[in-house]
Amino acid sequence: MNPNQKIICISATGMTLSVVSLLIGIANLGLNIGLHYKVGDTPDVNTPNVNGTNSTTTTIINNNTQNNFTNITNIIHNKNEERTFLNLTKPLCEVNSWHILSKDNAIRIGEEAHILVTREPYLSCDPQGCRMFALSQGTTLRGRHANGTIHDRSPFRALVSWEMGQAPSPYNAKIECIGWSSTSCHDGISRMSICMSGPNNNASAVVWYGGRPVTEIPSWAGNILRTQESECVCHKGICPVVMTDGPANNKAATKIIYFKEGKIQKIEELTGNAQHIEECSCYGAKEVIKCICRDNWKGANRPVITIDPEMMTHTSKYLCSKILTDTSRPNDPTNGNCDAPITGGNPDPGVKGFAFLDGENSWLGRTISKDSRSGYEMLKVPNAETNTQSGPITHQVIVNNQNWSGYSGAFIDYWANKECFNPCFYVELIRGRPKESSVLWTSNSIVALCGSKERLGSWSWHDGAEIIYFK
């Protein structure tokens, strides 16, 4: 190629590139002008387009045009603004037996995996589903710090929660608050959790709401300020919580504290016939909250607190039925007592328990053994709340008497798509010390069941771990 041809070739190439660049520039200018006017057509350029994707999430797309660049940002936002406070208007569902809901097998799994040492477990639900809760000991079953976890109170305990059905581990547990006594409940908008911590003679409570500490409560009697060890219940934003401070074997100071969004609305001293209150198991229906508690001082029959959350008032009495449900307890008497404790039982002064009191649809839970925390059974006892002669008409074994049980408590999925509130309960399956002293730890697994209108058979849902494998 001679020099003239080279010049012509280079010139043609340059002109071609110039034309292409010009066309690209024109296209870019047109695109930016078009986008500018498209955004400008809306009344407010900062107003996002909202596209609902499901009942719990919203996708927000923000279109912002600056300096001829268009940025599109996708934000996933929980639709808390569309939630409303839980309203306890429904009745309890009819229950003829109990079906299995969940079993975490924590001790069996912990023989090999990293599973937290826990006790005082419970379940609590929210609009998204149900979670398991427990007070962690800040160590695992195979950890050396598991030695001494038989003790209830230490600076290392925390209320943790995890997905229902899983075993609690350092990898799936969420810390709700720090302490050695707890309760937690959801009001339909956000969760309130309360933890007690500190020394026996000067403990305090910290109230969390929406993931932040909101209120602190000091000890009022200087003797182990403590609370329910299972879920509280809310109605129209008001969440009553039962707390006790004082002796475990004598008259103590119990208060019902009414919270809204973690802030105290009212405090009531315990009134009525109940003489000692600890570890209440509460549920709600028909705009009333009922708490079935533990009389650790005198009664083998359980005290009952009935709360009107709208009026923020309460009354207390004892479960009238002759079927005694605390442990330890004497043999069932000929007559119950609505107004006073029925004494007797040896050696343990009591255990956390529950009942669902709904006229003919009433159910009581108790250990099968009257002397120790072994076995567990559910008894349908019509009118147990009001009739001193009431006895069982239906019986279902939950844990056979050859296996350990422990605390038990009530919970309900108040957001389930039903015409009624279906009663549910859990049983703590304690393993390790003091009954099994060949290991250094004390921990538990959990089994949970819910009501069924069908008549289902019994089975033993015991823990099932072989302690010999931990040696």
UniProtKB/Swiss-Prot annotation:
GO terms for molecular function: exo-alpha-sialidase activity; metal ion binding. Residues 36-89 are annotated as: Hypervariable stalk region. Substrate binds at R119, R153, E278, E279, R294, R373. N-glycosylated. It is a single-pass type II membrane protein. SUPFAM superfamilies: Sialidases. Disulfide bonds join C93-C420, C125-C130, C185-C232, C234-C239, C280-C293, C282-C291, C320-C338, C424-C450. InterPro entries: Glyco_hydro_34, Sialidase_sf. Keywords: Calcium, Disulfide bond, Glycoprotein, Glycosidase, Host cell membrane, Host membrane, Hydrolase, Membrane, Metal-binding, Signal-anchor, Transmembrane, Transmembrane helix, Virion. Its EC number is 3.2.1.18. Residues 1-6 are intravirion. It comes from the Viruses. One of its GO terms (biological process) is viral budding from plasma membrane. Intact N-terminus is essential for virion morphogenesis. Possesses two apical sorting signals, one in the ectodomain, which is likely to be a glycan, and the other in the transmembrane domain. The transmembrane domain also plays a role in lipid raft association. Belongs to the glycosyl hydrolase 34 family. This is Neuraminidase.
